[in-house]
Amino acid sequence: MAINPPVDATQTPEWAALQKHYDELQVEGVSLKKWFAEDAERVEKLSFDAGDLHFDLSKNLIKPETLQLFANLAKAVKLDERTKAMYTGVHINNTEDRAVLHTALRRPVEDEGKYIVDGQDTVKDVRETLDKIYAFADDVRSGKWTGVTGRKIETVVNIGIGGSDLGPVMVYEALKPYADAGISARYISNIDPNDLAEKTKGLDPETTLFIIVSKTFTTLETLTNAREARTWLLEELTANGAIAEGDEAQKAEAIKKHFVAVSTNLEKVEEFGIDPNNAFGFWNWVGGRYSVDSAVGTSLAVVFGPARFEEFLHGFHEIDEYFANTPFEKNVVVLLGMLNVWYRNFFKVASHAVLPYDQYLHRFPAYLQQLTMESNGKSVRWDGTPVTSETGEIFWGEPGTNGQHAFYQLIHQGTQLIPADFIAFVNTPNPTKDGDQDVHELFLGNYFAQTKALAFGKTADEVRAEGTPEEIVPARVFSGNRPTTSIFGVALTPFALGELIALYEHITFVEGTVWGLDSYDQWGVELGKQLAKQITPAISQDDDALAAQDASTQSLIKFYRANREF
């Protein structure tokens, strides 16, 4: 099925209406303090619930009537049609001619037979793969699957890169309180030898299981690390007498007991030494940055168990259904996507902070960097024509309260407008008291205070009233009107985390639809990879390859050659 050209949002009456609205707000003067005072129902009008998550949009630079303008633009760019196309398997990944079906990864078994794409019953295939993963996970967790010496697995080491690493490591860190089988995980991604050296430090080879995650089983970084991990395992097992030196049969058995794969290239998997029966597949309609709930999450199923992984999937599906079935005017996923467009294209902001007030989410901003920036960091629309507006945002952040003592200064008093998402949960798995003070409430006090300070600021008169010397007053004034969205959950459970990830997946899709982007390809990573293959021979031995480089690259390589010590 051919994909229609994107609607040029900037040429629609709905875009013009938003521009007029923006201009009127600038003339009126944007003042959250004033808007709150004038409308006692502002918070109610700008608050939403989706699944277990609560959203407060009232501290954003919008009025309640802005939401209808957002919805109108979403309709104008045919968001509903593109959403239906994505959910039903139309090849909306135009440049790679692929369906985009991460939503199928979390559909319930009752949906088998309902989503046939390219002749494939997607839900049935997903459930069969999950059953295989769950059986494997149960075997590892119970001790039925052991290492080559018969000892229970205690550590799984995931080797992947990009979406094969960022998603699993983020979820592992986020859900650590749910690890209940005495199994921990480590994640190796960087081809830098330091990564593997540090991640294998202190590991017992007899109780370590490696999961190699590469759909094609040809990814340079992943396969390099996999081979190094295989060498490490065999050397360590030989050194401690677990296998006999030079015994190739024992080595082959050790690899089979200590390595499994997430890949569809069974020939390459077998060449590596992994039993192809211990390979878990996924499909070309699953993009890497949308794959944590596929077989890419096998390490998570092992650590947390199949039941928890199912809860995780249910959270995704909750938001999938909400997004697809809620009218745009009340659909907080759509509205948040449009809010990002509002700031990017009308306020001309380029940066978006994600500030989780939960230490377990410390890798969430890094995860969102790939999800959002690899998806929408593009200057060409899905039909090959240039974009007609700014696209993409720089996503970044750190957990509170750490960020408060690092970069919040810029958000509060800098010259840039930086919209920020504040994420927190009512309950903690680690309740603590400092005397009579509940420490989690002390923590959440900062969550509430920061959005209030950013919204309403502090005037010069308020600063003077504190007895501040006049010459210092300007430095202590806070302008306010710094926009934030508060996202509040009951607890950081597997279900809630699935909801949170799906939320941002669909926000990214909404933005990409407005901008006319194929949010599911990533050609920007290719050129550097191609050049690296050409340049690598020049680094140590090939003078002809060196001579073929530009002057700057030659100079850098010569510096390397002159100073290498190993």
Swiss-Prot record:
Organism for this UniProt entry? Bifidobacterium longum (strain NCC 2705)
The gene it comes from is pgi
Read off the NCBIfam families from this record.
PRK00179.1
The pathway that the record names for this protein is: Carbohydrate biosynthesis; gluconeogenesis; Carbohydrate degradation; glycolysis; D-glyceraldehyde 3-phosphate and glycerone phosphate from D-glucose: step 2/4
Q: What is this protein called?
A: Glucose-6-phosphate isomerase
Gene3D superfamilies noted in UniProt: 1.10.1390.10, Glucose-6-phosphate isomerase like protein, domain 1
Record key words, sorted: Cytoplasm, Gluconeogenesis, Glycolysis, Isomerase
At the top level of its lineage, which domain of life is listed? Bacteria
Q: Which InterPro entries match?
A: G6P_Isomerase, G6P_Isomerase_C, Phosphoglucose_isomerase_CS, SIS_dom_sf, SIS_PGI_1, SIS_PGI_2
Describe the function of this protein: Catalyzes the reversible isomerization of glucose-6-phosphate to fructose-6-phosphate.
- One Pfam family linked to the record: PGI
Tell me where it resides: Cytoplasm
Signal sequence residues: none
